């Protein structure tokens, strides 16, 4: 296959991913674990609801709300669809003063003319924007290995503020054309971090981050972790619909629900590191988001629920969904007597079920529950 064909394949694949997310049920068949996390209701909150402050600080910036619009797309065929999605999300992020990411910029690195599909500064001059490259592209065994040049291009071409490195071994392992070269990625990221002038966020894409991986990432200076846990969109599920043969379909189906649930991943990363956490993975309501914040996350990240209005260019539709989450978070905070996110991390939590069973075998659960702040 020639170079041109490989470039086109990347762009076409991005379009197929969007299409399947919109038209198919690509949700995990299991929950993200937050049903096992319980707030203790306070009949006397001792605060006024309208005094609750939802602002958070992250990588030197202050944001009005603890919600992160997760990266979804960019570089799709014709670029128009991806551009519309990203600009719609960016307008919403600009209005609410919350951060957002773009989808993988691999297509842009290969075909620079697709850069406009990621560019949102014309509609969102102040938004905190996170670029996005894949971890396998930094492997020592991959052809056309990425380094400082590509990382700078990803950030500076779209005037981003930080770079996410997405770790998606599950998706790549079940994708027909997947990149399964991961040897030497940690060393490459350590070298990149030593030279790179922007923050780097390590990001999973639906299978969660364990405390072992989190500790390694913290040791090389990574600035934050997006846990991207199990319980939301299954990228193995997406690849099931893209598979070309029965073996490929069977493989993707078998691993549809592989991974670490989001709630568990948040707890492990918070227990083992002092890094800021973005809790993505099946975040579909403000109560679950408030639980993630109480467990130590700085943001709850959301993607798929915003995709349908974003495809239509419906900025108000995106904002409406986000405002619903915001009000649900605020209400949960009121009912546990938390004036701000810092206080929310100190309210009592009760963890039950599978999540408790897992965490009791993996961490000192009582110690974690006593100290959930950064």
Curated annotation (Swiss-Prot):
Q: What is its EC number?
A: 5.3.3.2
Reactions mediated catalytically: isopentenyl diphosphate = dimethylallyl diphosphate
Q: Which residues bind Mg(2+)?
A: 172
> A GO term (biological process) for this protein?
isoprenoid biosynthetic process
Q: Which residue spans traverse the membrane?
A: none
Q: Where in the cell is it found?
A: Cytoplasm
- Name a GO CC annotation attached to this entry: cytoplasm
Annotated FMN binding lies at 71-73, 104, 132, 203, 233, 282-284, 303-304
Tell me the SUPFAM superfamilies matching this sequence.
Answer: FMN-linked oxidoreductases
Cofactor names from the entry are: FMN; NADPH; Mg(2+)
List of residues binding substrate: 13-14, 104-106, 171
Q: Which UniProt keywords apply?
A: Cytoplasm, Flavoprotein, FMN, Isomerase, Isoprene biosynthesis, Magnesium, Metal-binding, NADP
Q: Which GO terms describe its molecular function?
A: FMN binding; isopentenyl-diphosphate delta-isomerase activity; magnesium ion binding; NADPH binding; oxidoreductase activity
Quote the function comment for this protein.
Involved in the biosynthesis of isoprenoids. Catalyzes the 1,3-allylic rearrangement of the homoallylic substrate isopentenyl (IPP) to its allylic isomer, dimethylallyl diphosphate (DMAPP).
Assembly, per entry: Homooctamer. Dimer of tetramers.
Similarity comment: family membership: Belongs to the IPP isomerase type 2 family.
The name under which this protein is listed is Isopentenyl-diphosphate delta-isomerase
Gene symbol of the encoding locus: fni
């Amino acid at each position: 296959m020639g170079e041109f064909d490989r470039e086109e394949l990347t762009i076409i694949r991005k379009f197929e991913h969007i299409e399947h997310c919109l038209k198919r049920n690509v949700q995990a068949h299991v929950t993200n674990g937050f049903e096992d996390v319980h707030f203790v209701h306070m009949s006397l909150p001792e605060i006024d609801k309208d005094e609750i402050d939802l602002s958070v600080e992250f990588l030197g910036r202050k944001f009005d709300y603890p919600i992160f619009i997760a990266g979804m797309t960019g570089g799709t065929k014709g670029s128009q669809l991806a551009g519309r999605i990203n600009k719609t999300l960016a307008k919403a992020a600009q209005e609410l003063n919350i951060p957002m990411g773009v989808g993988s910029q691999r297509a842009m690195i290969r075909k620079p003319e697709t850069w406009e599909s990621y560019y949102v500064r014309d509609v969102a001059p102040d938004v905190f924007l996170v670029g996005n490259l894949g971890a396998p592209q930094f492997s020592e065994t991959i052809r056309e290995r990425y380094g400082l040049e590509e990382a700078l291009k990803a950030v500076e071409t779209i005037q981003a503020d930080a770079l996410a490195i997405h770790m998606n071994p599950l998706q790549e392992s079940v994708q027909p054309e997947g990149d399964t070269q991961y040897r030497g990625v940690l060393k490459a990221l350590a070298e990149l971090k030593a030279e790179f002038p922007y923050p780097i966020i390590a990001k999973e894409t639906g299978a969660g981050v364990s405390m072992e991986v989190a500790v390694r990432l913290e040791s090389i200076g990574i600035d934050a972790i997006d846990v991207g846990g199990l319980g939301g969109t299954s990228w193995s599920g997406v690849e099931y619909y893209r598979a070309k043969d029965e073996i490929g379909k069977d493989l993707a189906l078998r691993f549809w629900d592989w991974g670490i649930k989001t709630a568990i991943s948040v707890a492990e990363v918070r227990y083992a590191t002092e890094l800021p956490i973005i809790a993505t993975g099946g975040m579909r309501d403000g109560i679950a988001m408030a639980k993630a914040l109480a467990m130590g996350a700085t943001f709850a990240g959301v993607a798929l629920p915003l995709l349908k209005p974003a495809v239509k260019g419906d900025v108000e539709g995106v904002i409406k969904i986000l405002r619903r989450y915001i009000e649900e978070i605020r209400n949960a905070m009121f009912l546990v007597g938390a004036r701000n996110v810092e206080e929310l991390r100190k309210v009592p939590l009760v963890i039950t079920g599978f999540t408790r069973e897992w965490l009791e075998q993996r961490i000192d659960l009582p110690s974690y529950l006593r100290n959930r702040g950064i």
